[in-house]
Regions:
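Glycine-/small-residue-enriched transmembrane alpha-helix faces in small-molecule transporters
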Residues: 1-41, 149-174
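Hydrophobic transmembrane alpha-helices of multi-pass small-molecule transporters
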Residues: 48-55, 83, 107-115, 130, ...
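Small-residue-rich packing faces within the transmembrane alpha-helices of Major Facilitator Superfamily
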Residues: 21, 45-49, 134, 166, ...
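Specific alpha-helical transmembrane segments that line the substrate/conduction pathway
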Residues: 38-49, 78, 87-121, 161
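Juxtamembrane C-cap of transmembrane helices in multi-pass membrane transport proteins
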Residues: 23-34, 46, 83-94, 102, ...
Length: 190
């Protein structure tokens, strides 16, 4: 492995955190100039402009069409339903703190239903971890939890976010767990 490649691989987690953490501020800024689903389209186009050339260069293997269909179901659930609800909540003047806290319930919701949906057992230790994680999220966001002037529709959209991301996560784990992430990103954004 070359030094440049090694540096890039070591930097990837930090680049991911930077891109993920910038999501709320960039979304809030973008919603000042455009509608939620237009912003989602721009976001998807940006991701595709980066990922498609990369996947072509590395010759990422294209899966069978049945697997593509499963990946597309996850993509619609994540990109349209989850992010569409999140962007609509923020557009409905729900504070970023409240939206993040509600969406942050996803691990708890997933743990609550993973036994029923996938037959997996959640241990006491995992429950403690999920609870501590949610408590940490609450503490970090506590100063930004002002309910503010959010609309009823905005709060309803925020309430849907953990449901949609949980559904997408469980479906992906069941049907797309071994899919090539480069192709997953392309199909989910398309």
């Amino acid at each position: 492995m070359t030094a440049d490649k090694s540096l890039f691989i070591r930097a990837m987690p930090f680049l991911f955190i930077l891109s993920w953490a910038s999501g709320f501020p960039i979304t809030r800024l973008g919603l000042e100039y455009t509608e939620p689903f237009t912003l989602l389209w721009v976001r998807s186009a940006f991701v595709l402009a980066i990922v498609v050339p990369f996947a072509l260069i590395v010759r990422a293997p294209w899966p069978h069409w049945k697997e593509v269909a499963h990946i597309a179901v996850v993509g619609v659930t994540l990109q349209c339903l989850y992010l569409g609800s999140m962007f609509s909540a923020l557009d409905g003047d729900v504070s970023q703190g409240v939206a993040a806290l509600v969406a942050g319930m996803q691990p708890l919701l997933t743990a609550a239903v993973v036994g029923i949906t996938l037959g997996e057992r959640v241990t006491r230790r995992q429950w403690i971890g999920f609870t501590l994680g949610f408590a940490g999220l609450f503490i970090v966001l506590s100063e930004r939890l002002g309910i503010g002037a959010g609309t009823m529709a905005g709060f309803m959209f925020a309430g849907l976010t953990p449901i949609f991301i949980t559904a997408a996560s469980l479906y992906q784990k069941k049907f797309c767990a071994n899919s090539d992430l480069r192709i997953v990103m392309i199909v989910q954004q398309a």
